[in-house]
Amino acid sequence: MIKIIQITDPHLTKDKNTEIRACKTYSSFKRVIHWIDRNEKPNFILVSGDISDDGSIESYLLYKNKIESLNKPFFSILGNHDNHDNFKLIFQNNFPIVQSIPLSDEWVLIVLDSTVTGKEGGALINNQLIKIRKLIEINSHKNLIFCLHHHPIEMGFWIDEIGLQNKDQFLSLILDKPNVKAV
């Protein structure tokens, strides 16, 4: 069995004392990492966006220090608050618009960059939608998990305003596919 832990929206800044909606973001992230370290044994950790709130290099250094302390494979998806260039400076890699990550012989994680520069809401571009269709076909014998920062299903409150803008296109690709197990 594969165990994946998902962490989302740490909203770290260069200031460890930043509070957002009465939450000290660094302190909260540190407690989450500590809890995982003491209580869980994941095979893989997925951080699904808004790693930083200010996009600063310092925030990504804080993140790197904590996430790497778990000594587990991890993958980071960027969100609307993240800065791709500063993230790349710290992690020395590009964040592809679509990436397929084999988790085992039977499971594949497909991560999508749904960020749109200068926008809070997200979208998938046509090239991504084509790649998604191909990945579903190529991996028809495997279980697929899709992960993106912007949610494709309406939740019924303010967050819907910044969800996936072309959710209908994305959902039409995945809804009737038996090998798509989770989003």
Describe these PLM feature segments.
Residues 1-62:
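N-terminal active-site segment of His-dependent metallophosphoesterases
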Residues 2-14, 107-116, 145-149:
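Active-site-proximal beta-strand elements of phosphoester/diester hydrolases
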Residues 5-27, 84-94, 117-126:
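Acidic/histidine-rich helix-loop elements
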Residues 16-18, 47-68, 83-96, 122, ...:
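Metal-dependent catalytic neighborhoods of phosphoester/phosphodiester hydrolases
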Residues 18, 142-182:
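Active-site-proximal segments of metal-dependent phosphoesterases and phosphodiesterases across multiple
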Residues 74-84, 181:
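A short, structured active-site edge motif that brings together acidic residues
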